[in-house]
């Protein structure tokens, strides 16, 4: 009731005030009633939660003093700052300011904060302890001087939080490091792997080169071992004989009658295609031995071409034995040399009978061993073939020759024994083709000349023996002797004494003289000095 009375009083006083003219001004001071009314309005506004200002007059020139106080009472509260903190995942949430609309208060929990509009839901941030990095987190402490601790536009850190709240957020989100050391580790690992690969490749290349060198030495040791065996079998005192026997056809009149053949390297299995033996100048006799010894020396194998190893591998079957090498060398020698003397180790195909002696024979018709060139060698050499060395002996497959002294004694035995002479003739000629003995000395000379031409080979013109006149039918005997014709010289001479054999049809020629050595079973008498203990006659 008292309040209603007061309101009535106030309304009446306000009506009286409005009844006054607006432009009138009172000079007298105001009474105590308006002051009392103003005090009452303030009290009622405080009790009701805010009172409105007095409504303006009609012309809007007056405003009640209570209007300013109501506007100040309705102003929004200041914005609150939520400080940065570490959440439950160990991640740092930066500081933010609650200044949007009516959301002026920092609410929530210590590990999850947000802005709200209710004052009673405010969070006491000073009571939280998650402003530092947790112990279980692996992130290093952030560097000082970061900008993460800067506050919002309208606020700052609370009282007592300037140091420990800003220090908790230094470096911002870049505080979680580790990228630098991880990148350098990757580079180091890649470098180590590359270095290991390079070392492995280099080691493999070096090992392959080291293993290839012993293999080449093993390949070349086989022919070198064979050369070493031949040099040891030849002996230290056989070099003069080797030098003499290397020239297959020395001249009869002397060493200057014919230039010696160019010495051939017997150990070189690869022929040089651009060299010809006819274009080479003949060496002097003084340099013959030195050239031969150097070409056949065991230590002069450095002249072999680079393809020596490949030639040894591809030609291993062809040059596997000394017998094949001897055949090849002897074929070339028969094609290139001139027939100047009888080969060693051969006997005439027909023996001579002294007329009227009844089987007795003499050496005077043939001449002495010195005239026939059958003088014994000072140091004969013999070389066993490779098949004989590596096999079971095999003596039945070869025909071994004898020294010259023993050949002369064997010739004496054949001339003194008719039975041995008959067996020798049966061995050299087929039984139905064995001719009769020559009747006179003229026929003996003709027969000896024909045998000389037979044994000398097809290299040049026929040359008679020393001390014997050349016969008239020398070419015919040479042809028949080479092609196996059994008709001797005295069978074509009707005036010869002692009787003749019945005539046989001449042998039909199957090939030329050069093709004879390539026909199977028609090889010429061949003999090779091979510097071994057992000479091989092919």
UniProtKB/Swiss-Prot annotation:
| Residue ranges of the motif PDZ-binding | 535-538
The record describes its quaternary structure and partners as:
Interacts with GABA(A)R (GABA type A receptor) subunits GABRA1, GABRA2 and GABRG2; the interaction is direct. Does not interact with GABRB2 and GABRB3 subunits. May interact with AMPAR subunits GRIA1, GRIA2 and GRIA3 and AMPAR auxiliary proteins SHISA6 and SHISA7. May interact (via PDZ-binding motif) with DLG4/PSD-95 (via PDZ domain); the interaction is direct.
List the top taxonomic levels of the source. Eukaryota, Metazoa, Chordata, Craniata, Vertebrata
Name the record gives this protein: Protein shisa-7
Glycosites: 23, 59
* Keyword Transmembrane among UniProt keywords: yes
Q: Which PANTHER family match?
A: PROTEIN SHISA-7, PROTEIN SHISA-9-RELATED
Q: Which gene encodes it?
A: SHISA7
The chain's Extracellular topological domains, given as residue ranges, are: 20-186
List where in the cell it is found: Postsynaptic density membrane
Function text: Transmembrane protein that regulates gamma-aminobutyric acid type A receptor (GABA(A)R) trafficking, channel deactivation kinetics and pharmacology, necessary for fast inhibitory transmission in the brain. Enhances the action of benzodiazepine, a primary GABA(A)Rs target drug, in the brain. May affect channel kinetics of AMPA-type glutamate receptors (AMPAR), the brain's main excitatory neurotransmitter, necessary for synaptic hippocampal plasticity, and memory recall. May regulate the induction and maintenance of long-term potentiation at Schaffer collaterals/CA3-CA1 excitatory synapses.
């Amino acid at each position: 009731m008292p309040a209603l009375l007061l309101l009535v009083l106030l309304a009446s006083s306000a009506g009286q005030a409005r009844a006054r003219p607006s432009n009138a001004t009172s000079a007298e001071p105001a009474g105590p009633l308006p002051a009392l009314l103003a005090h009452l309005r303030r009290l009622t506004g405080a009790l009701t939660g805010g009172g409105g200002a007095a409504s303006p007059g009609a012309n809007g020139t007056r405003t009640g003093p209570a209007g300013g106080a109501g506007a100040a009472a309705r102003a929004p509260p200041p914005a609150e700052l939520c400080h940065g903190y570490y959440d439950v995942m160990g991640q740092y949430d930066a500081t933010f300011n609650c200044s949007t609309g009516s959301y002026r208060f920092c609410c929530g929990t210590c590990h999850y904060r947000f802005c709200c509009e209710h004052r009673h839901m405010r969070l006491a941030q000073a009571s939280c302890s998650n402003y530092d990095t947790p112990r279980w987190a692996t992130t290093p402490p952030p560097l000082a001087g970061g900008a993460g601790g800067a506050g919002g536009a309208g606020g700052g850190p609370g009282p007592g939080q300037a140091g420990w709240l800003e220090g908790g957020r230094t470096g911002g989100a870049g505080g979680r490091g580790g990228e630098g050391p991880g990148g350098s580790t990757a580079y180091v690992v890649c470098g180590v792997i590359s270095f290991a690969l390079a070392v492995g490749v280099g080691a493999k290349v070096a090992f392959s080169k080291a293993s290839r060198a012993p293999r080449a030495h093993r390949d070349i040791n086989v022919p070198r071992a064979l050369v070493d065996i031949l040099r040891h079998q030849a002996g230290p005192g056989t070099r003069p004989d080797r030098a003499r026997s290397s020239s297959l056809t020395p001249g009869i009149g002397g060493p200057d009658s014919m230039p010696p053949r160019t010495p051939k390297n017997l150990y070189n299995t690869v022929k040089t295609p651009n060299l010809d033996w006819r274009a080479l100048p003949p060496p002097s006799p003084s340099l013959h031995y030195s050239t031969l010894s150097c070409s056949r020396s065991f230590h002069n194998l450095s002249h072999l071409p680079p393809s020596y190893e490949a030639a040894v591998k591809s030609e291993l079957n062809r040059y596997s034995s000394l017998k094949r090498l001897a055949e090849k060398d002897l074929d070339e020698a028969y094609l290139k040399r001139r027939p100047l003397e009888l080969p060693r180790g051969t006997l005439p195909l027909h023996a001579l009978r002294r007329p009227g002696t009844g089987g007795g024979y003499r050496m005077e018709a043939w001449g002495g061993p010195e005239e026939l060139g059958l003088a014994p060698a000072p140091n004969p050499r013999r070389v066993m073939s490779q098949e004989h060395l590596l096999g079971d002996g095999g003596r039945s497959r070869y025909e071994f020759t004898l020294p010259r002294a023993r050949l002369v004694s064997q010739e004496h035995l054949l001339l003194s024994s008719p039975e041995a002479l008959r067996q020798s003739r049966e061995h050299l000629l087929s039984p139905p083709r064995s001719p009769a003995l020559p009747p006179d000395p003229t026929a003996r000379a003709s027969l000896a000349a024909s045998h000389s031409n037979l044994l000398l080979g097809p290299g040049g013109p026929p040359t008679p023996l020393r001390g014997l006149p050349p016969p008239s039918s020398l070419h015919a005997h040479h042809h028949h002797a080479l092609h196996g014709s059994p008709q001797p010289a005295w069978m074509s001479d009707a005036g010869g004494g002692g009787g003749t054999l019945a005539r046989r049809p001449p042998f039909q020629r199957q090939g030329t003289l050069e093709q004879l050595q390539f026909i199977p079973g028609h090889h010429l008498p061949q003999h090779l000095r091979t510097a071994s203990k057992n000479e091989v006659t092919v």
